[in-house]
From Swiss-Prot:
GO terms for biological process: L-histidine catabolic process to glutamate and formamide; L-histidine catabolic process to glutamate and formate. GO terms for cellular component: cytoplasm. It comes from Burkholderia cenocepacia (strain ATCC BAA-245 / DSM 16553 / LMG 16656 / NCTC 13227 / J2315 / CF5610). This is Imidazolonepropionase. Catalyzes the hydrolytic cleavage of the carbon-nitrogen bond in imidazolone-5-propanoate to yield N-formimidoyl-L-glutamate. It is the third step in the universal histidine degradation pathway. Fe(3+) binds at H68, H70, H238, D313. It is found in: Cytoplasm. The gene is hutI.
């Protein structure tokens, strides 16, 4: 690529709307790395001969990060949506053989090509909203071959689309039917066979567990964490969504990258997260979709200074959400977060939840030039508008990979 100076832009380099530069410029070298940024009036003379790209006063933020998704799976669960509307709880559906296990059946039956095509269709709306990094979990295979298939598809998405994909092995997502009544035996399989094999194949960036009364116990979760730690892999946790099971404190002991959901999180768990540097990932799409009433403890998270990230939690059962911008709005309207909080929640803090705050979530000299260009008058509009296409252009590694066509 040709070295380029992107200029006449309003720059928000760290995702905080109170830290901006008017009439700014970003100089990107031939490797796609940011060589300089700041006020256009201070642009060094050495960049005078570089190609110019005029953004006509548009806002520029770091590329967005969706740090919790289950994007690869077979089928849908629209029928269960109707059941929930009729009063059947998520837990009841799961106990009747629905829920996660129904998606497991569909995912096992699908081949890699089918899973790729379906996941690609879910990914593209996110890319058109400025997402340049995304986490994709496994967890709908629940056997070695199917978990491998999911993670291979996730890797392929990162190779064939302009987005950095971080993969998370979530083999301990639910108990597969063939292990009914034998949860400890299944955890043996996860720890002794599935995780080592998939890690050796280079398919795993992090390890997650669903720690809940309808998922896995603290003791079982710790076994998975121990297996991940032996492999040098960071851990994450689905925690305190339906009850306070104490999973967050356990995650903090293992210095988890993040603990996610957290509606029933208590102050002791928050203190443990703060001490461990664990990010709180809140998922308002799931809260909305399954009509939860227990709000996550936003004020306590603020009080203790725990970084808060937001994500779509895209999945077929509890959050079939394909808009990170709508997630911003939900964070404000449902969880009473501020605009600075939600914007940092999908940039700097979301990157930290992936363990890659050094790579994503900010625009700084020496970093890859991943940024989004917005047709808004103020950054508050990113959380304000519902359904309006706001992203005009996405740049990844200094190259435009998306441009909205007018009309």
């Amino acid at each position: 690529m040709k070295p380029t100076v992107w200029h006449h832009l309003r720059l928000c380099p760290h995702g905080h709307p109170d830290e901006t530069i008017d009439d700014a410029a970003i100089a990107v070298d031939e490797t796609g790395t940011i060589a300089w940024l700041g006020a256009l009036s201070a642009l060094p003379h050495g960049y005078a001969h570089w190609r110019r790209e005029d953004l006509h006063g548009a806002w520029v933020t770091p590329g967005l990060v969706d740090c919790h998704t289950h994007l690869v799976y077979g089928g849908t669960r629209a029928d269960e949506f109707a059941q929930r509307l009729a009063g059947v709880s998520y837990e009841e559906i799961a106990r009747q053989g629905g829920g996660i296990v129904s998606t497991v059946r569909a995912t096992r039956a699908a081949d890699e090509t089918t899973l790729f095509v379906q996941a690609a269709a879910r990914l593209q709306p996110l890319l058109a909203e400025g997402v340049t990094a995304i986490e994709i979990k496994s967890g709908y295979g629940l056997d070695l071959a199917s978990e491998r298939k999911m993670l291979r598809v996730a890797r392929q998405l990162g190779e064939r689309f302009p987005v950095t994909v971080h993969t998370t092995f979530l083999g301990a997502h639910a108990l597969p039917p063939e292990y009914a009544g034998r949860a400890d035996a299944y955890i043996d399989e996860v720890c002794d066979r599935m995780l080592p094999t998939l890690a050796d194949e280079g398919l795993v960036d992090a390890v997650d567990v669903f720690c809940e009364r309808i998922g896995f116990s603290l003791a079982q979760t710790e076994r998975v964490f121990e297996a991940a730690t032996r492999r040098g892999l960071p851990v994450k946790l689905h925690a305190e969504q339906l009850s306070n099971a104490g999973g967050t404190a356990l995650a903090a002991r293992y210095r988890a990258l993040s603990a996610d959901h957290l509606e029933f999180l208590d102050e002791a768990g928050i203190e443990a997260m703060k001490a461990a540097g664990t990010v709180a990932v809140l998922l308002p799409g799931a809260y909305y979709f399954i009509r939860e009433t227990q709000l996550p403890p936003i004020e306590l998270l603020r009080k203790h200074g725990v970084p808060i990230a937001l994500a779509t939690d895209h999945n077929p059962g509890t959050s079939p959400l394909e808009s990170l911008l709508l997630t911003l709005n939900m964070g404000c309207t449902l969880f009473r977060m501020t605009v600075p909080e939600v914007l940092q929640g999908v940039t700097r803090h979301a990157a930290a939840a992936l363990g890659r705050a050094d790579r994503h979530g900010a625009l700084e000299v020496g970093r890859q030039a991943d940024f989004a260009v917005w047709s808004v008058g103020s950054l508050a509009e990113l959380a304000y508008w519902i359904g309006r296409p706001l992203c005009e252009q996405v740049v990844r590694g200094g190259t435009t990979v998306f441009r909205r066509m007018n009309g």
